[in-house]
Every structure is written in C-alpha cells, then in structure tokens.
C-alpha cells in the first residue's frame, strides 16, 4: 500500500512540476523499436508526464504511451510533435 501511495505521490509531483512547455520540432521522431519485444498490451511505460501529440490529434502522456498506440494501430498513428495537441 505504501508503494502505491508513493507512486501516486511521485506521479502527482511530476504532473504539477512539469512547468516547461516543450516546443515542437518538425524533424523530431519517436523510436518505437525498443517496445517491439513486448506484447502491445504489456508495454511497461514509465509514469512521467512529457506530453506528445499523435497524428490522431490525441495528446499522449509520453513517447512510450504514443508508441503503444503506434504499435497497436500497425503504424496508422504517427508522431506529430512534442507537447499537447
């Protein structure tokens, strides 16, 4: 129970302290190759809030979560830019 509480506190602190907005970089990409060794339903994404925008115009919590959707959609969803959509 203490572990869960600690993780929730860490997530909340990360969310609140994410004060800098990331600018978009048109040439930036996301490399999902490291996640291909896991089943799509079991990709171990970290609990950090560094938002990225997918080509479906959904803001994902971080690049790992976007990669999960990219792999789930067989590449139909792509990385658009860093930051919120």
UniProtKB/Swiss-Prot annotation:
Transmembrane segments: none annotated. Disulfide bonds join 32-67, 45-64, 53-85. The keyword Transmembrane does not apply. Residues 1-19 form the signal peptide. It is found in: Secreted. One of its GO terms (molecular function) is serine-type endopeptidase inhibitor activity. Keywords: Disulfide bond, Protease inhibitor, Secreted, Serine protease inhibitor, Signal. Pfam families: Kazal_1. Residues 20-85 form the Kazal-like domain. GO terms for cellular component: extracellular space. InterPro entries: Kazal-type_SerProtInhib, Kazal_dom, Kazal_dom_sf. GO terms for biological process: inflammatory response; negative regulation of cytokine production involved in inflammatory response. It comes from the Eukaryota. The record marks 47-48 as: Reactive bond. Probable serine protease inhibitor. This is Serine protease inhibitor Kazal-type 7. The lineage of its organism: Eukaryota, Metazoa, Chordata, Craniata, Vertebrata. The gene is Spink7.
């Amino acid at each position: 129970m203490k572990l869960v509480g600690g993780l929730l506190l860490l997530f909340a602190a990360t969310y609140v302290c994410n004060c800098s907005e990331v600018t978009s970089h048109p040439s930036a990409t996301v490399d999902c190759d490291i996640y291909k060794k896991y089943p799509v339903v079991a990709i171990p994404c970290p609990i950090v809030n560094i938002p990225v925008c997918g080509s479906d115009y959904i803001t994902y919590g971080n690049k790992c979560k976007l990669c999960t959707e990219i792999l789930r959609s067989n590449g139909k969803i792509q990385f658009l830019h860093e930051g919120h959509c």
